[in-house]
Design a protein with these regions (language model features):
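ATP/NTP phosphate-donor binding region
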Residues: 1-53, 63, 98-102, 296, ...
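N-terminal glycine-rich "phosphate-gripper" loop used for MgATP/nucleotide binding
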Residues: 55-59
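Short Gly/Thr/Asp-enriched flexible loops that form oxyanion-binding sites at enzyme active sites
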Residues: 61-74
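Glycine-rich phosphate/pyrophosphate-binding beta-alpha loops
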Residues: 135, 139, 190-204, 272
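Gly/Ser/Thr-rich active-site loops/lids in small-molecule metabolic enzymes
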Residues: 150-158, 202-226
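ATP/nucleoside-binding phosphotransfer catalytic cores, i.e., glycine-rich phosphate-binding loops
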Residues: 183, 208, 218-300
Length: 300
């Protein structure tokens, strides 16, 4: 579970644990205190033979836990407790922690694919899985500048505030975006394995977490004026009609630059990961996830 942020959240978590125990789940509670704890705790639970891992937190916490499980086979259940909660929404889970806990005993296991990012960091090859979204460029830069305390206090409003600040400061560096050998350029790209971005927005063509491949939205313009227009288009869901916006799909995505001074960040499930060049691919049959019966109907 992500560290308790308030008295209200503490009460919700303890009530959810009580619900699980009433349902016969012998739950051992572990709290995260710093980045990386979710991955470490999930790895320890997997290697110790735990039957089920229940992750309570936002998409970043879920991402850490997934990377602690895979390539193991321990099933994962989710209690939504973050800002965007894309993973929970994609699975059809209630938005309330306690209600989601009540549903766990009725959920079924499903095997789903995951996205995987591969990149170099100081000469070391790194890999990380992601469930829903990767962002390259502008949104990753926002995350790199975001004040953690403000995020905890304000939630999604902190992202909006930082986006407004950065739209006038960002350098809008172009990079090469290649989808299955089709190359183009972009200043901001979203690579989705989900139907949602930032919790409720829909940028790319419809995609579901159990589908193979990626659905991508590219923004190719530069400067504050163009990006403010993009923001208006995204909110009104007319962005795909704007000049410099492209919708693509592919099974392997590569983002790179031929300019050595280019420094473009990318994020995975809302958490800063690294800098380009980076390659995204899909790993089929990668994770066992618990979801309601309604999730099976979206697979048809």
């Amino acid at each position: 579970m992500a560290g308790m942020k308030s008295a209200r959240r503490s009460a919700e978590i303890h009530k959810a644990v009580a619900v699980l125990r009433e349902a016969g789940v012998d739950a051992e509670i572990q709290f995260t205190a710093s980045p990386g704890d979710g991955r470490r705790l999930a790895t320890e639970a997997t290697t110790s033979g735990c039957d089920l891992i229940i992750a309570c937190g936002g998409d970043g916490t879920i991402n850490e836990v997934i990377n602690g499980i895979v390539p193991g086979n321990t099933p994962l259940a989710i209690l939504p407790g973050g800002t965007a909660n894309i993973a929970a929404k994609e699975l059809g889970l209630p938005g309330n922690i306690v209600r989601a806990a009540r549903q766990i005993s009725a959920c079924r296991p499903y095997r789903i694919p995951l996205g995987r990012a591969t990149w170099e960091d100081s000469g070391i090859t790194k890999q990380r899985y992601f469930l829903a979204v990767a962002g390259i460029g502008f949104d990753a830069h926002i995350i790199s500048q975001l004040d953690v305390g403000m995020k905890l206090r304000m939630g999604v409003l902190a992202y909006i505030w930082e986006a407004v600040r950065q739209v006038f400061r960002y350098r809008y560096q172009a990079f090469q975006f290649t989808a299955d050998s089709r190359a183009t350029s972009s200043t901001f790209a979203v690579v989705q394995r989900s139907s949602r971005y930032a919790g409720w927005l829909r940028l790319a063509r419809p995609h579901r977490v159990h589908d193979l491949g990626f659905s991508c939205c590219l923004f190719q313009g530069e400067g504050p004026g163009r990006y403010l227009l993009y923001a208006f288009g995204i909110v009104t869901q007319t962005h795909d009609r704007l000049h410099g916006v492209r919708l693509l799909s592919g099974s392997e995505i590569r983002c790179a630059s031929d300019q050595p001074e280019t420094s473009v960040y990318f994020e995975l499930d809302g958490e800063l990961a690294g800098r380009i060049p980076v390659t995204f691919e899909v790993v089929p049959d990668a994770l066992t996830i618990l979801a309601p019966e309604s999730f099976s109907r979206t697979q048809q």
